[in-house]
Amino acid sequence: MSLIPSIFGGRRSNVFDPFSLDVWDPFKDFHFPTSLSAENSAFVNTRVDWKETPEAHVFEADIPGLKKEEVKVQIEDDRVLQISGERNLEKEDKNDTWHRVERSSGNFMRRFRLPENAKVEQVKASMENGVLTVTVPKEEVKKPDVKAIEISG
């Protein structure tokens, strides 16, 4: 195990992937003590897995604690999948004394450029146990018609 994080992110990411719209952050794997509040940590770092099956592109995002009403899935500009959400702070009572605040609040947004074979009009999304699953069906690859030509002579 290396003590220095990979400069290009996790094992499944590819800096040269033309479909990724993430901005590369060289400091994302370093855990520096900062004055940033907890609201900037969990949502800014919302992780999304993208796998391609023979039938579809499947996106899975871990967003624990959010209700489906607090999450939006949209297709922008015909080929950009946008996943966003927001969790608000709890209402404070003047008589309450907080000893620790670790649950995060704030918003997040992740964007992915979909490939040409995506059927953007048939996108489906579901959420279960804090995991959002977005399924984008793929166009069937039409195999070219092959015609055998007889060789004379």
From Swiss-Prot:
It is found in: Cytoplasm. Keywords: Cytoplasm, Stress response. One of its GO terms (biological process) is response to salt stress. Residues 39-153 form the sHSP domain. Pfam families: HSP20. InterPro entries: A-crystallin/Hsp20_dom (IPR002068), HSP20-like_chaperone (IPR008978), Small_HSP (IPR031107). GO terms for molecular function: unfolded protein binding. Gene3D superfamilies: 2.60.40.790. One of its GO terms (cellular component) is cytoplasm. Belongs to the small heat shock protein (HSP20) family. Forms oligomeric structures. This is 17.5 kDa class I heat shock protein. The gene is HSP17.5-M.
